[in-house]
A protein has these predicted regions:
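A structural detector for beta-sheet-dominated domains
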Residues: 9-11, 28-32, 68, 76-78, ...
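Exposed beta-strand and adjacent loop surfaces of beta-rich binding modules
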Residues: 5, 72, 100
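Short, compact, well-ordered microdomains
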Residues: 76-129
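N-terminal intrinsically disordered, low-complexity, charge/repeat-rich segments that act as generic
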Residues: 1-42, 50
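Glycine- and charge-enriched low-complexity intrinsically disordered segments
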Residues: 35-37, 47, 52-57, 119, ...
Length: 133
């Protein structure tokens, strides 16, 4: 298991034929050896699983990954009734460069993002070791 910083950018689609590097997410997640979310570590330290949403219109938000029943994952921003973006099959996705991730926005529109970087986050690894000491 390793803590990883992941950059997702909007993939090509009808509204953005070339995709967009200005629309995306920066994620800090624990990944297993197959590049998938390490759910057991998430359960221990959910507060370290952070999301930074970036948009062209400067509607940037910071939030956390949340898990509901089954394989229902969301990006949550703030209060319990605040914006949530649904993540179909999030627990099954790999987060390796070139892989694709789907995000359903708060209006129910499906957007596809491509993993453009996935690098170790040693600071988070130290936080984890400190938390378990």
């Amino acid at each position: 298991m390793s803590w990883t910083r992941i950059r997702l950018e909007l993939a090509r689609g009808p509204d953005h034929p070339e995709g967009s590097h200005r629309i995306g997410y920066e994620l800090s997640l624990p990944l297993d050896t197959k590049g998938r979310l390490a759910v057991s570590v998430f359960r221990e330290l959910p507060e370290l699983c952070t999301i930074h949403r970036q948009r062209e219109d400067s509607d940037e938000r910071v939030g956390t990954l949340k898990h509901h029943r089954g394989d229902h994952w969301v990006f949550a921003y703030g209060a319990p009734d605040a914006l949530e973006e649904n993540l179909p099959r999030f627990g099954q996705h790999r987060f390796q460069v070139g892989d694709y991730i789907s995000v359903l926005d708060d209006h129910g529109h499906d957007h596809t993002y491509r993993v453009v970087s996935s690098v170790p986050a040693p600071g988070l690894a130290h936080a984890r070791m400190g938390a378990s000491s």
